[in-house]
């Protein structure tokens, strides 16, 4: 029998606010344990939460970018369970009335566009974390670090519209790109800023009844998501083929084996006893707030890509690469704003700039060559002042120093030679010195042409205008 | 007259005239606690050193001309208020060793006003109880008759006032926890409108019902205390951003033309004869002062107690989850694993009444029962609120009993929780409606126990009920009666 997978994803996005969702503590990652806490995030007796408006702002941004409806009134609820890193014995989350609902994202897999529904986006607080064994000052016990407690999260829940691991990854990549673009998440998956729970089930092809699903928790890389889902689909099909039954349970992905394993079964499932948090009044969001936020949104990758294709005439590939991150796109657009030609800027940003950044292990935001400087360089090429090849030398110099390209060209005497008389003189000398090759060319061995071009360029120290060289050389060689 | 016998405003006047210093008043109070509290058990913690230091600071402040109504006044707080550096138990073994790292908003306001905190008062554990018997630190006794309960849960707040071992106190009122003990102990007790006083730093029992309020010797003191602690707090999202009126200025003595409602559902056939007699006399007093009476109906009153015990316990089951032995408070020794540690710490740390309510609340919120219990209770709560709003279209305030009977004997209802729950039948609807109410002394039972009357105001109508209570107080002598200890 053939099977069809049904996948829904729950993505946890850690928000890049300076302070926590219900108190004023810092959210900086990596501080010493419990140094970023106060009575509120410690869940001390008597404390009350106060909602951070920035978190709401970020949630609205995420909702608008994913085509959701922003609820004019939403409610915080308590999710009650016991765990040592959960200071209050409940997590404040949204339940029945979340801030965003009924959105969607379009993904592209194998050239096919597909729409994935987004059920809801809600705000919640993170828990702390447990540190086991060798805790400084505790010996071999377990310690609780509550620095992360009360850190703001968005949970973005998809509809079970995803049908393969590739679609899941495409959806996740897209979501990741959007939240980073929006400036609401640093996107750092290793630090857990963007992590995913995958709900997977299988059913016979053509069936309309979903099979029993499992939930694989906290997968934090695109590669692992693909592996985890593929393994889970395979495991469930095998189980059914062998006459077994899939049990509804929570599973963990083991990156070492590429497999998922059972974490807890349904019999241990929690009754979270959700109810509206009486310490927080319902959140009312005005239409003006939503519309102001809509106006402040950056242009999102999809819109940018299609604009690059239609208005700038760039290829699909170029548009894709240039919009991969907001910083990359902004760098590119700053070049255009400074007067760079679109295609030239695209080639240079994707070529030399990216190469140099990779070699230096730098991000485009830290690029030492400012867009205006790169544009000036491109303009020197356009005007014919320097050749594209020389430009690479100039670029390397710009990377090292803080000099303008014009200054470098002048200082090093790199101005391109387009003067036909000077070039003719070089060609004559080289032809005279290589009569054998001239004969070969004239005998029909046209490959030798390249040899002459190389010789002329070398003799001119790369400064000869290649177009002029080609033209004159062809004329002279043909006699 | 002894210094400890002075009301807050009398002491304030003496401090203002420099007839007495705060240190003298504080010493007198500490001596009174020493002399009475082994019998009354109103205090869990007495803080003489901190109090005398604060009194000295208050005297310096008074000398510098910085006197406010509370400067230099010895006050005591229900042990539900979180106090920085001072053990805060909430009447529970599970918090028996808890020393908070912060002050709540109300405590900070009192300190800023220069009040002298002399100690932390006994209470029913986590404010759950109507008799003061369910404290892990032993039952509080009624100073009028040590064999009787003082009422609860703010048992120590009322008993200390009656015993003259605090000049003024603060309690909390979730279902009547200020008004009912104030009534049983012959004090004035006010439950302000929900949102009027910050709950930040008040250990939560039922968040949507809890409210901070004063217990005092007379209505003037009550107005002064409320003025000192009321107001918007950015740390409490449910606190309301409204200006705080000058409550003391509202005490004009005038009730002529005031329309008082008598809810027919509150005047039951079986009302205790002493309570009935006191109310009838109070109505006559008000008539004599020119107030008008209107019979009104609060048709959903019958459902109030059941509704309260679903909502309060549901919220409590969640609010009390943090007491799990992990980070503070009592942790059971020798647990086999994590779950066992949670389970045993809570089993050892909580008393019977708290456990009973956590169980009820957990049940009411559990899947499959949520709609039938919690959600239904919320709907009834809305109906009860609407009852009050309709009544307030006709009248300025309601006049009702506070408790169905005067204080009962210690131990009398301990084994009958349902009977005990009914002792809050006249106070609970106010909490569900989120409005304000005051209890003032209005009589004595044949057995020599105080009886209070309740005035219920519209939301943020504290000035009206304070004015009405004050006028009644001026026309009667009940607040001058003193328990003999
Ligand atoms: Zn904090």
From Swiss-Prot, chain A:
Keyword Protein biosynthesis attributed: yes
PANTHER family per UniProt: GLUTAMYL-TRNA GLN AMIDOTRANSFERASE SUBUNIT B MITOCHONDRIAL AND PROKARYOTIC PET112-RELATED, GLUTAMYL-TRNA(GLN) AMIDOTRANSFERASE SUBUNIT B, MITOCHONDRIAL
UniProt KW Zinc keyword: no
Protein name (database record): Aspartyl/glutamyl-tRNA(Asn/Gln) amidotransferase subunit B
UniProt-listed Enzyme Commission number(s): 6.3.5.-
Entry keywords, A to Z: ATP-binding, Ligase, Nucleotide-binding, Protein biosynthesis
Residue ranges that the Swiss-Prot or TrEMBL entry lists as coiled coil: none
GO MF, one example: glutaminyl-tRNA synthase (glutamine-hydrolyzing) activity
Similarity comment: family membership: Belongs to the GatB/GatE family. GatB subfamily.
Catalysis performed (reactions): L-glutamyl-tRNA(Gln) + L-glutamine + ATP + H2O = L-glutaminyl-tRNA(Gln) + L-glutamate + ADP + phosphate + H(+); L-aspartyl-tRNA(Asn) + L-glutamine + ATP + H2O = L-asparaginyl-tRNA(Asn) + L-glutamate + ADP + phosphate + 2 H(+)
Primary role: Allows the formation of correctly charged Asn-tRNA(Asn) or Gln-tRNA(Gln) through the transamidation of misacylated Asp-tRNA(Asn) or Glu-tRNA(Gln) in organisms which lack either or both of asparaginyl-tRNA or glutaminyl-tRNA synthetases. The reaction takes place in the presence of glutamine and ATP through an activated phospho-Asp-tRNA(Asn) or phospho-Glu-tRNA(Gln).
Entry-linked InterPro entries: Asn/Gln-tRNA_amidoTrfase_suB/E, Asn/Gln-tRNA_Trfase_suB/E_cat, Asn/Gln_amidotransferase, Asn/Gln_tRNA_amidoTrase-B-like, GatB, GatB_C_1, GatB_Yqey_C_2, Gln-tRNA_amidoTrfase_suB_CS
BP-aspect Gene Ontology terms: glutaminyl-tRNAGln biosynthesis via transamidation; translation
Enzyme class: ligase
Subunit relationships: Heterotrimer of A, B and C subunits.
Curated annotation (Swiss-Prot), chain B:
Gene Ontology BP, a term: translation
Role according to the record: Allows the formation of correctly charged Gln-tRNA(Gln) through the transamidation of misacylated Glu-tRNA(Gln) in organisms which lack glutaminyl-tRNA synthetase. The reaction takes place in the presence of glutamine and ATP through an activated gamma-phospho-Glu-tRNA(Gln).
GO molecular function, one term: ATP binding
Source organism per UniProt: Geobacter sulfurreducens (strain ATCC 51573 / DSM 12127 / PCA)
Keyword Nucleotide-binding on entry: yes
Protein name: Glutamyl-tRNA(Gln) amidotransferase subunit A
Assigned GO CC terms: glutamyl-tRNA(Gln) amidotransferase complex
PROSITE patterns (alphabetical): AMIDASES
Pfam hit, one: Amidase
Keyword line: ATP-binding, Ligase, Nucleotide-binding, Protein biosynthesis
HAMAP family named in the record: GatA
Family in the record: Belongs to the amidase family. GatA subfamily.
Gene transcribed to yield this protein: gatA
Subunit structure comment from the entry: Heterotrimer of A, B and C subunits.
EC number: 6.3.5.7
Annotated active site: 78, 153, 177
Enzymatic class: ligase
Catalytic activity: L-glutamyl-tRNA(Gln) + L-glutamine + ATP + H2O = L-glutaminyl-tRNA(Gln) + L-glutamate + ADP + phosphate + H(+)
Residues that span the membrane, as ranges: none
């Amino acid at each position: 029998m053939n099977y069809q997978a049904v996948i829904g994803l729950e993505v946890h996005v850690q928000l890049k606010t300076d302070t926590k969702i219900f108190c004023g503590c810092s959210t900086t990652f990596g501080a010493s344990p419990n140094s970023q806490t106060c009575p509120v995030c410690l869940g001390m007796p008597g404390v009350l939460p106060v909602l951070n408006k920035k978190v709401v702002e970020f949630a609205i941004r995420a909702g608008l970018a994913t085509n959701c409806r922003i609820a004019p009134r939403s409610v915080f609820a308590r999710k009650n369970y016991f765990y040592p890193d959960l200071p209050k014995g409940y997590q404040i989350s949204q339940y029945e009335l979340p801030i965003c609902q009924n959105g969607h994202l379009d993904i592209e897999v194998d050239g096919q566009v597909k729409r994935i529904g987004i059920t809801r986006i809600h705000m919640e607080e993170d828990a702390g974390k447990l540190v086991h064994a060798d805790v400084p000052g505790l010996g071999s016990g377990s310690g609780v670090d509550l620095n992360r407690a009360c850190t703001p999260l968005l949970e973005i829940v998809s509809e079970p519209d995803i049908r393969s691991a590739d679609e899941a990854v495409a959806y996740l990549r897209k979501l990741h790109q959007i939240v980073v673009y929006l400036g609401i998440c640093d996107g750092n998956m290793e630090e857990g800023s963007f992590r995913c729970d995958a709900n997977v089930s299988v059913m016979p092809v053509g069936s309309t009844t979903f099979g029993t699903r499992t939930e694989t928790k906290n997968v934090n890389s695109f590669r692992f998501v693909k592996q985890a889902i593929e393994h889970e689909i395979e495991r469930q099909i095998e189980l059914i083929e062998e006459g077994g039954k899939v049990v509804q349970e929570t599973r963990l992905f083991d990156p070492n084996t590429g497999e998922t394993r059972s974490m807890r079964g349904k019999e241990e499932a929690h009754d979270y006893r959700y109810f509206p948090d009486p310490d927080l009044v319902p959140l009312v969001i005005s239409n003006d707030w939503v519309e102001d936020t809509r106006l402040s949104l950056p242009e999102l990758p999809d819109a940018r890509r299609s604009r690059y294709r239609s208005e700038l005439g760039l290829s699909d590939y170029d548009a894709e690469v240039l919009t991969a991150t907001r910083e990359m796109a902004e760098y590119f657009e700053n070049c255009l704003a400074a007067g760079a030609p679109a295609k030239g800027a695209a080639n240079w940003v994707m070529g030399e700039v990216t190469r140099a950044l990779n070699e230096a292990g730098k991000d485009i935001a830290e690029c030492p060559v400012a867009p205006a400087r790169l544009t000036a360089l491109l303009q020197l090429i356009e005007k014919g002042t320097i050749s594209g090849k020389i430009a690479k030398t100039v670029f390397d110099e710009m990377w090292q120093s803080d000099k303008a390209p014009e200054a470098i060209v002048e200082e090093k005497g790199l101005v391109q030679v387009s003067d036909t008389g000077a070039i003719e003189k070089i060609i004559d000398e080289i032809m005279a010195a290589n009569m054998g090759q001239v004969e070969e060319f004239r005998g029909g061995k046209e490959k030798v042409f390249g040899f002459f071009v190389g010789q002329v360029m070398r003799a001119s120290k790369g400064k000869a205008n290649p177009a002029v060289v080609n033209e004159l050389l062809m004329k002279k060689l043909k006699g | 007259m002894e210094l400890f016998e002075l009301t807050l405003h009398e002491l304030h006047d003496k401090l203002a005239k420099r007839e007495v210093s705060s240190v003298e008043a504080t010493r007198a109070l500490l001596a009174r606690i020493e002399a009475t509290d082994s019998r009354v058990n109103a205090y869990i913690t007495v803080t003489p050193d901190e109090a005398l230091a604060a009194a000295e600071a208050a005297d310096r402040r008074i000398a510098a001309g910085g006197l406010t109504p509370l400067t230099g006044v010895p006050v005591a707080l229900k042990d539900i208020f979180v106090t920085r550096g001072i053990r805060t138990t909430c009447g529970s073994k599970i918090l028996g060793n808890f020393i908070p790292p912060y002050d709540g908003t109300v405590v900070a306001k009192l300190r800023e006003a220069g009040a002298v905190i002399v100690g932390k008062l006994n209470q029913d554990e986590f404010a759950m109880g109507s008799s003061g018997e369910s404290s892990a630190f032993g039952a509080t006794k009624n100073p009028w008759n040590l064999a009787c309960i003082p009422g609860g849960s703010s048992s120590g707040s009322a008993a200390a006032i009656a015993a003259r071992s605090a000049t003024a106190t603060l309690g909390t009122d979730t279902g009547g926890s200020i008004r009912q003990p104030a009534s049983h102990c012959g004090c004035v007790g006010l439950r302000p409108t929900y949102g009027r006083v910050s709950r930040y730093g008040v250990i939560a029992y039922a968040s949507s019902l809890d409210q901070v309020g004063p217990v005092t010797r007379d209505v003037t003191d009550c107005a002064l205390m409320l003025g000192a602690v009321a107001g918007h707090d950015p740390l409490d999202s449910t606190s309301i951003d409204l200006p705080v009126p000058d409550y003391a200025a509202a005490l004009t003595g005038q009730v002529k033309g005031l329309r008082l409602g008598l809810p027919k559902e509150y005047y039951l056939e079986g009302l205790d004869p002493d309570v009935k007699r006191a109310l009838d006399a109070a109505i006559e007093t008000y008539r004599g002062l020119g107030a008008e009476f209107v019979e009104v109906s609060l048709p959903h009153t019958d459902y109030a107690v059941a509704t309260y015990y679903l909502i309060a316990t549901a919220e409590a089951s969640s609010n009390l989850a943090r007491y799990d032995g992990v980070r503070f408070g009592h942790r059971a020794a020798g647990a086999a694993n994590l779950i066992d540690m949670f389970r045993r710490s809570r089993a050892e740390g909580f008393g019977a009444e708290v456990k009973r309510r956590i169980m009820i609340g957990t049940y009411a919120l559990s899947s499959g029962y949520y709609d039938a219990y919690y959600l239904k209770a919320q709907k009834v709560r809305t109906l009860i609120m609407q009852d009050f709003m309709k009544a307030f279209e006709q009248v300025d305030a309601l006049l009702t009993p506070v408790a169905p009977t005067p204080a009962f004997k210690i131990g009398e209802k301990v084994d009958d929780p349902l009977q005990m729950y009914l002792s809050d039948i006249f106070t609970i609807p106010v909490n569900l409606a989120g409005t304000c109410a005051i209890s003032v002394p209005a009589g004595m039972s044949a057995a020599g126990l105080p009886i209070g009357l309740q005035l219920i105001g519209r939301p943020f109508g504290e000035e009206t009920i304070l004015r009405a209570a004050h006028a009644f107080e001026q026309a009667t002598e009940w607040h001058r009666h003193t328990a003999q200890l």
